[in-house]
Amino acid sequence: MALWGGRFTQAADGRFKQFNDSLRFDYRLAEQDIIGSVAWSKALVTVGVLTAQEQSQLEGALNTLLEEVLENPHAILESDAEDIHSWVEGKLIDKVGPLGKKLHTGRSRNDQVATDLKLWCKTQVHALLSATRQLQQALVVTAEENQDAVMPGYTHLQRAQPVTFAHWCLAYVEMLARDESRLKDTLKRLDVSPLGSGALAGTAYEIDREQLAGWLGFASATRNSLDSVSDRDHVLELLSDAAISMVHLSRFAEDLIFFNSGEAGFVELSDRVTSGSSLMPQKKNPDALELIRGKCGRVQGALTGMMMTLKGLPLAYNKDMQEDKEGLFDALDTWLDCLHMAALVLDGIQVKRPRCQEAAQQGYANATELADYLVAKGVPFREAHHIVGEAVVEAIRQGKPLEDLALGDLQKFSPVISDDVYPVLSLQSCLDKRAAQGGVSPVQVAQAISAAKARLA
């Protein structure tokens, strides 16, 4: 049943109907559409459109319909209704007869769909917040178990300075904490009800929109009806939140793909999140991580697509805005799946401590310590930097790490070097000296783990 047929003398072309209909994806808003309709029926009682008895009958039928939807949401797709609003109204009329035709009084699909989508987004935000926190907790657990796993830190994919696997985990805890903060901030602006804004100019019935917003669980009602039906900022914000977080997850995946490679060999992934090759029997591929990395692209595309859809639209509802849902649904589903999968990857990961330590001792990752040692002896840092560079060249020539160079060889580059340099060049010394807030020292890492556990409790 179309909701707009009276103006037309010809039926819609079947090809146009297929092109125009949105039920195949907006069926996901069924629960929210029914909840919004129940609240609207209560509002219509306050302005005398419905009697209390009529409202009770409508609410009972809508609640029954909601139970049916929750039991089998995909049954909606068997209908040829134009959209979820048409489907709900048609089912309601089937249940209560002509009374169902009164429900849409004073309401437009424009404020109806805006309300449905905001309600759906609120539910998704809470699910995403939970998943984001769960992944942070998984990272903290992994960090706590690997505080003593020393590994090389990288810049430009070259060994730079020693860190610990725990410190690496905690870096992603910080990124995800920002993702969590962005979601919470988005929720503040999302938590405003557009219902009662009508098509664009407001409803002709003196409904208490603040009361209506409260019935729906919103913090308040919107202040301008034209903005209310035009606004899709919450879609853009959520897609932006998703895009940023997926970049974090993609970097997490890329790091672990490298750590898991035969060339690095720092970790081994669980069989539960890897797959094999149809040709090469020896292969154990990090497919879960590669898919997280790959799915990042589709989320960035959804954000870009929505920006382009909205950029040229005049105010109020335009059919272009029907394009807000598929990309949003897919992006948030993808983000949620990737958060869960990242946590699963951590569950069962094995850190190969001997190999990590071996790699940390290679590549002259302690060169900065030698420079700091020289600074402590009164050598200006820029001069110390040059001296250490020359010492590294000599160590490479001899095929030795810095700490294995003879004292005489080191003193060729600076006479201030004495035998007290060797303890400074040890891995443990490299870590211990990074004791400022946020550093990689064992004390700082332990404090960071405790703080993260307290925040996430």
UniProtKB/Swiss-Prot annotation:
Keywords: Amino-acid biosynthesis, Arginine biosynthesis, Cytoplasm, Lyase. It catalyses: 2-(N(omega)-L-arginino)succinate = fumarate + L-arginine. GO terms for molecular function: argininosuccinate lyase activity. Pathway: Amino-acid biosynthesis; L-arginine biosynthesis; L-arginine from L-ornithine and carbamoyl phosphate: step 3/3. Its EC number is 4.3.2.1. Coiled coil: none annotated. SUPFAM superfamilies: L-aspartase-like. GO terms for biological process: arginine biosynthetic process via ornithine; L-arginine biosynthetic process. It is an enzyme of class 4 (lyase). It is found in: Cytoplasm. One of its GO terms (cellular component) is cytosol. InterPro entries: Arg_succ_lyase_C, Argininosuccinate_lyase, Fumarase/histidase_N, Fumarate_lyase_CS, Fumarate_lyase_fam, Fumarate_lyase_N, L-Aspartase-like. Its main location: cytoplasm. NCBIfam families: argH, PRK12308.1. Belongs to the lyase 1 family. Argininosuccinate lyase subfamily. HAMAP family: Arg_succ_lyase. This is Argininosuccinate lyase. It comes from Cronobacter sakazakii (strain ATCC BAA-894) (Enterobacter sakazakii). The gene is argH.
